[in-house]
Amino acid sequence: MTTPLLSVENLQTQFETAEGTVRAVDGISFDVHEGETVGLVGESGAGKSVAISSVLRLVESPGEIVGGEIRFRGETLLSFEEGPNGERRQSPESLSNKEFRQRIRGREIATIFQDPMESLNPVFTIGSQLQEFIEINRELPPKDARDVAIETLREVDIPKPEDRFDDYPHEFSGGMRQRVLIAMAIACQPSLILADEPTTALDVTVEGQILNLVSDLQEEYGTSFVWVTHDLAVVADICDRVNVMYLGQMAEQADVHDLFDNTKHPYTEALLQSVPRPDKTVESLTPIEGVMPEAINPPSGCRFHPRCPDARAVCREVNPEPRNVSDTDTRHNAACVKHDAFDVDYEHSTPIQSEGDEFGEDLQVTEGSR
């Protein structure tokens, strides 16, 4: 087995608030290998964006990474150890924030953010922002950096980049602004790009163009991607493997085809049943009952059990970590005790009501709302 390009183990990021501690990312692990696209999927509030920000060390106060290990090409970027008084602290082998900023962020690991208007400075031209980024990260003189910037804009299919170089962000359409962010991400030819829902604000036609562009660039440069999204159609189109998150934890991890064809976790199944699928014909879609709980006070046991149609009493007691439950040689991890791999006597445990069952008599869903 080859060493992963990126390895994240037991990552924990939390936010201290007046109401208590929000465990936004609570012990997730995943790998990314050379040249592959890995999906990070889940509803809003699952912790996807916080996970990406943690890898990039962009978590803002009052947020803090409090545990886990992140390795890149086998080198430890971040790890923790126990201090003399029992406190958890960064280990000496972790890169300092300055080292990470100078060596890793932008050069080896880049990002594409969701909203270009928040990521681009409105008072500076597109070209000046891209040129400055290249000057800093590739250590090029201004003229050479400008030439590289123009060529990079050309690579992401911005027409006449020499003429658009001195235009401001508001003079570009949403799709074109997203292309500028992609240009900024690939300008230093990084090995890994973390894309945080980069097509969410775009219409379907422009989204398709952006996905095709990313696919072409990946083929040209061999870049790996972590693609954060709630859109399962995008996942099916571009991802090699998928990680499904729920309330700060991993619910399921599998090859993309295996995930869609042989789903192992009730949450993933619920996600798939709530969206149209071209490979299946259904009379109506089934929404996921209830809402995701707050991470400040998660349910006991499995965090999905209050909404799960398969929940039993044991699900209130056991919070399972993802485990291989595959029926084949292909690894397929799921955090659900209904599988024999967990050996908790699920079959003989008493079924419990999900939120949908409990409030079903009062819940009316019209055909137009499905």
Segments and roles (model prediction):
Residues 180, 186-187:
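ABC ATPase C-loop
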